[in-house]
């Protein structure tokens, strides 16, 4: 377990003043002993610019994580390759060509996998009709539980949260943050039954954000491009929004 986890939102659809943004999602993760990147937006230039504004060094990354193959999550990885050539990136099945061509080292995840001592992949879940294989990242924070970072949640954000808990041998999850892909209220209700904090971003949609904010105000947390969240045993605290 880590004592704390800090999340720097490099890109979300909504930017804070002074940041650049487009449709995409990317988070720089920092914990005691490692730094990683979860997804990488659409644009290398936006990743580089916002990393500079947030004061994070892409060259210090130790590993990367790609939730699924859509370009608004992987298109900025050339910037990562420039800063950290040969970086190991955990990817779902079928997602190796672009990463390798950009000079990164794709590692295909076929099931629940520890990617660091205190971080694990849920393993890929299928979205059924769409045929998209997507996995989520879970980090165990001491005294709190699992922080689950999702990309677009094509298989369902509730299913990804359940898979994270199952992979970690936990009863539930503490925090879920990322794109929820326009979820139904029933999906959000199920998520609220297993998560203490819910942070919808990216493709979640304004209706989902408002539903969580008004129906579960004690569980809601917000983030956008430029946000910095510190997560420890007390839960997520927004250091910068």
PLM feature segments, named:
Residues 45-90, 165-175, 196:
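Active-site metal-binding motif and surrounding structural segment of the metallo-beta-lactamase
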């Amino acid at each position: 377990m880590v004592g704390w986890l800090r999340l720097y939102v490099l890109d979300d659809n909504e930017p804070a003043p002074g940041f650049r943004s487009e449709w995409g999602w990317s988070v720089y993760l920092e914990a005691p002993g490692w730094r990683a990147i979860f997804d990488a937006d659409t644009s290398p230039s936006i990743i580089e610019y916002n990393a500079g504004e947030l004061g994070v060094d892409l060259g210090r990354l130790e590993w990367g994580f790609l939730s699924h193959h859509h370009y608004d999550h992987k298109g900025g990885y050339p910037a990562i390759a420039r800063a950290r050539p040969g970086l190991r990136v955990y990817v779902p099945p079928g997602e190796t060509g672009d990463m390798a061509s950009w000079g990164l080292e794709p590692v295909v995840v076929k099931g629940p996998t520890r990617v660091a001592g205190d971080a694990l992949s849920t393993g890929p879940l299928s979205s059924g009709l769409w045929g998209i294989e997507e996995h989520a990242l879970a980090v165990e924070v001491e005294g709190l539980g699992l922080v689950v970072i999702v990309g677009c949640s094509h298989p369902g954000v509730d299913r990804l949260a359940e898979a994270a808990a199952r992979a970690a041998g936990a009863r539930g999850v503490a925090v879920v943050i990322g794109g929820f892909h326009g979820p139904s209220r029933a999906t959000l209700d199920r998520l609220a039954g297993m998560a203490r904090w819910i942070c919808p971003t990216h493709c979640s949609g304004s209706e989902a954000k408002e539903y969580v904010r008004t129906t579960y105000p004690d569980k809601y947390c917000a983030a956008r491009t430029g946000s910095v969240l510190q997560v420890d045993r007390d839960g997520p605290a927004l250091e910068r929004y």
